[in-house]
Amino acid sequence: MTPYIIETILKVLVVVAIFSALAGFLTYVERKVLAFMQRRLGPMHVGPYGVLQILADGIKLFTKEDIVPVGANQTIFKIAPVISAATAFIAMSAVPFFPEFELFGHTVRPIIADINVGILFVLGVGAVGMYGPLLAGMSSGNKWSLLGAARATVQLLSFEVVSGLSILAPLMMVGSLSLIEINNYQSGGIFDWLVWSQPLAFLLFLIAGYAELNRTPFDLLEHEAEIVAGFATEYSGMRWGMFFIGEYANMITLAFLVVLLFFGGFNPLWFIPGGIAILLKVAVFLFLFLWVRAAWPHIRPDQLMWVCWKVLMPLALLNIVLTGIVLIL
């Protein structure tokens, strides 16, 4: 094998290992943050401050019985969780996580595939991930699962359009679909960040991201009070876990995308090196995702569609038109 292939394989293994662990650890962080905001303690008994709770949860998931309902389409039922988890990690392959660095005299580029349509690839693979909940709900032979699948299709397709339209305006300014080029466009300092020239695009992209991740207040796919666990109702054990590993991995990817698109990416921030700066910015957005879950109420499906098609979509189109006019002038 050529050195390039070996390096790519090593990068894939490192990304999958690190972000699988981070996705699991994020569940612990979420429980502690929610507990703090609700005046509770959260996990406390497994390890110091409950930090080993993720190991206990992992053992529980691996040892639980894997049940396939009698009325389910077994092949599709088993494939659906794999689609959700796989697309989450495939999307990461075009995301530049850090600036280049030297390791044992070799220059390492912390991106698996530096393609010139990086943002398009990430959004496209993320859209394919919709088939996970859709196939899971359709194949389960359960009415609650089917309702969850229907909600997943409507919600994710609708907000995928908003997500794509929202980033058109900043892409028009940059003139490239490459995430590295978008990062380099903001290399002049904090005042070159695209969030200052495209605040509406940032808000639209962030809201659409919440909806595509199935995060509060847009958690309609598996809302317990209405449709039990939605598309995941009939799942147990590690198959159930794969859905939520995919969800938290997508959350990390979205945080990186927001930072790369609007907040200077991995460019140095004053005296802070670029690698540390991007981690701090990503951590802020991950905390924001958890904070919103604790603070915001659940909304109805009709309200969600109204917001998408009658508020967010026109605003995204208006932003594109205004940006085009400004660029022409």
Curated annotation (Swiss-Prot):
GO aspect biological process, one term: aerobic respiration
Localization, UniProt: Cell inner membrane
Keyword Repeat among record annotations: no
Bilayer-spanning residue ranges: 9-29, 79-99, 117-137, 162-182, 188-208, 243-263, 269-289, 309-329
EC numbers for this chain: 7.1.1.-
CC annotations in GO: plasma membrane
Recorded catalytic activity of this chain's protein: a quinone + NADH + 5 H(+)(in) = a quinol + NAD(+) + 4 H(+)(out)
Function: NDH-1 shuttles electrons from NADH, via FMN and iron-sulfur (Fe-S) centers, to quinones in the respiratory chain. The immediate electron acceptor for the enzyme in this species is believed to be ubiquinone. Couples the redox reaction to proton translocation (for every two electrons transferred, four hydrogen ions are translocated across the cytoplasmic membrane), and thus conserves the redox energy in a proton gradient. This subunit may bind ubiquinone.
Subunit comment: NDH-1 is composed of 14 different subunits. Subunits NuoA, H, J, K, L, M, N constitute the membrane sector of the complex.
Protein name: NADH-quinone oxidoreductase subunit H
Annotated gene: nuoH
